Structures are given as C-alpha cells and as structure tokens.
Amino acid sequence: DPCYEVCLQQHGNVKECEEACKHPVEY
C-alpha cells in the first residue's frame, strides 16, 4: 500500500500508519 509505505518512510510508526491509511490522509 503506497500510503503505508510513505507513512512508514516518513514516520516509522506501524500502528499510526495502519490507522492513518484506513482513511484518506495527507502528508
């Protein structure tokens, strides 16, 4: 999932990324 990949690269927080990527998110 691109959202998840980008989130992990930028934040490195798996739990946060899982939550964030359930919904449209802007980075």
UniProtKB/Swiss-Prot annotation:
Entry keyword Oxidoreductase: no
Disulfide topology: C3-C21, C7-C17
Tissue: Expressed by the venom gland.
Keyword presence, Ubl conjugation: no
Compartments reported by the entry: Secreted
Keyword line: Disulfide bond, Ion channel impairing toxin, Neurotoxin, Potassium channel impairing toxin, Secreted, Toxin, Voltage-gated potassium channel impairing toxin
Annotated GO CC locations: extracellular region
GO MF annotation, one: potassium channel regulator activity
Summary of the function given for this chain in its UniProt record: OmTx1 decreases the amplitude of the potassium current of the rat channels Kv1.1/KCNA1 by 17% and Kv1.2/KCNA2 by 12% as well as human Kv1.3/KCNA3 by 24%. OmTx2 decreases the amplitude of the potassium current of the rat channels Kv1.1/KCNA1 by 8% and Kv1.2/KCNA2 by 10% as well as human Kv1.3/KCNA3 by 36%. Also alters glucose-induced insulin release from pancreatic islets.
Entry's family note: Belongs to the short scorpion toxin superfamily. Potassium channel inhibitor kappa-KTx family. Kappa-KTx 2 subfamily.
Domain notes: Has the structural arrangement of two alpha-helices stabilized by disulfide bonds (CSalpha/alpha 2(S-S)).
Protein name, entry field: Potassium channel toxin kappa-KTx 2.2
Protein species of origin: Opisthacanthus madagascariensis
Lineage: Eukaryota, Metazoa, Ecdysozoa, Arthropoda, Chelicerata
